[in-house]
A protein has these predicted regions:
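Glycine-/small-residue-enriched capping loops at alpha/beta junctions
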Residues: 1-103
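Phosphate/ribose-phosphate-bearing ligand recognition and processing surfaces
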Residues: 81-203
Length: 203
């Protein structure tokens, strides 16, 4: 049974088989998660990605992870050329990412909150979509036994807690002062969940 965890911190620091980049169809990595991955792992990641462009919205491609601790970067094409996104694009890009992860045989995989940075997609809706797709795809992905949602800040952390909790109301407002997520962006915190245990509530 796969383990799902929330982590408040930089996805580039994670020692997993593959991290996911929220990519656009041109695959340039200048801003957001892509920019952070390129700065931490080197320009070679972007060069390898751009060689595969242009790509379709909702698809996913694989490159090495450069000097990062991860082995691969899976670029989830969740943003169009103008860096706009939609729920459908996020869902399709996630499904494509899981397909690439199965091909690679990855055991551990880390996602950012797709589309919620430069794409401006609502955090609560992104969390619900991503958690729903994850619970649908993990049973089809037998090699994956550890999945992390790598988030930055209280608001994102709380919305994914809500999406994973069987007791929380969908779309509930964020209340940072009542959240168990850490206030400091550089202070990672982990909450464990088990895929397939009801709606993904706390283990």
């Amino acid at each position: 049974m796969a383990r799902i965890e929330l982590w408040n911190g930089d996805i580039c620091e994670l020692e997993v088989d593959a991290i996911v980049n929220a990519a656009n169809t041109s695959l340039w990595m200048s801003t957001g998660v892509g920019g952070a991955i390129k700065r931490a792992g080197g320009d070679a990641i972007e060069f390898a990605a751009v060689r595969q462009a242009p790509v379709e919205l909702g698809s996913a491609i694989v490159t090495s992870a450069g000097t990062l601790a991860a082995r691969y970067v899976i670029h989830a094409i969740s943003l169009d050329r103008d860096r706009r996104t939609s729920g459908g694009a996020i869902k399709a890009a996630m499904r494509s990412t899981f397909a690439r992860a199965r091909e690679l045989g990855v055991i551990s995989l880390a996602f950012p909150a797709l589309g919620t940075g430069v794409g401006g997609f609502p955090l609560d809706e992104a969390a619900r979509i991503m958690v729903a797709v994850t619970h649908d795809e993990l049973p089809k992905s037998p090699t994956i036994d550890y999945l992390i949602f790598a988030l930055r800040g209280v608001a994102a952390y709380r919305q994914f807690e809500i999406a994973l909790s069987p007791d929380a109301e969908p779309g509930a407002p964020v209340a940072p002062e009542a959240s168990t997520a850490p206030d400091a962006l550089d202070s990672p915190d982990v909450s464990p969940y088990l895929a397939g245990s009801g709606a993904g509530g706390p283990a």
